[in-house]
Regions:
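Gly/Pro-rich interdomain helix-loop hinge
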Residues: 162-222
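Glycine-rich flexible loops
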Residues: 36, 87, 93, 98, ...
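Glycine-rich phosphate/pyrophosphate-binding beta-alpha loops
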Residues: 31, 138-171
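Amphipathic alpha-helical interaction segments
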Residues: 104-108, 112, 132-135, 154-157, ...
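Carboxylate- and glycine-rich phosphate/diphosphate-binding segment that chelates Mg2+/Mn2+
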Residues: 39-147
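Glycine/threonine-rich beta-strand-loop-alpha-helix active-site module
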Residues: 1-68
Length: 225
């Protein structure tokens, strides 16, 4: 995107300074959401570091979601990329700067991914599940490119660069732990997500459905996925 400039010099915000050709994105995973985001992540193998390049010119003009292109994705990659998309949505939703419009995108993503990830994993050729996963990843991409992500991604990028752990796998492991560490700061948004998608129900029906209880239920559902 910029001649004779190392990736490290483009790492960060708005450093490309160049108009790019028409960019069309056709995702084959669900996923990174890169078909609607302003970010590119490039691993420097020499120093084991992941450079994040962010610029508005990197947002594709058009995105084509074809479920048939993801039906051959292996189960492990389906799981990892699906949890990456889930993490995008949850972290964006919990961000205090997330607007109501972006919350709606994130909520839709969580609902779609939560309802379809296991089906896509178990039934790779299920085009309905694959399409719902692509749509969920797309919605999550819109949400986090506007509201950003949090500590889960910050830690996962470091681990991935140093130890070559698949990004989605790192996110899947870290997401419930980081959300639990946030404590009461995220009870309210997680409770709203749980009320909307009802991924799990408290086993003890006598327990009052407080924000804390619902947030705990949502975190447990992420572990069970």
């Amino acid at each position: 995107v910029k001649r004779d400039l190392p990736v490290g010099k483009m790492s960060g915000m708005l450093k490309i300074h160049k108009k790019l050709p028409l960019l069309l994105a056709v995702p084959t995973t669900a996923g990174t959401g890169s078909e609607v985001t302003l970010a590119a992540v490039i691993t420097d193998e020499t120093c084991h570091y992941k450079h994040v390049v962010m610029d508005y010119c990197l947002i594709p003009r058009y995105a084509f979601l074809d479920p048939g292109l993801s039906c051959s994705l292996p189960p492990d990659m389906t799981a990892y990329s699906g949890m990456d998309a889930m993490t995008h949505a949850v972290e964006a939703y919990c961000n205090r700067f997330c607007s109501p419009k972006m919350k709606a995108h994130a909520m839709k993503a969580v609902s779609l991914i939560g309802a379809n990830l296991l089906t896509a994993y178990r039934e790779p050729a299920n085009k309905a599940a694959r399409m719902n996963m692509l749509t969920g990843s797309y919605e999550a991409g819109i949400a986090f490119t506007n509201a950003y992500v949090g500590y889960v991604h910050a830690i996962a990028h470091g681990i991935g660069g140093l130890y070559h752990v698949p990004h989605g796998e790192a996110n899947a492991i870290l997401l419930p732990k980081v959300l639990a560490a946030y404590g009461s700061a995220v009870y309210e948004p997680l409770a709203r997500l749980e009320r909307k998608v009802r991924t799990s129900v408290a086993e003890d029906e006598s327990r009052e459905e407080t924000d804390a209880v619902l947030a705990e239920a949502f975190i447990l559902s992420l572990i069970h996925i």
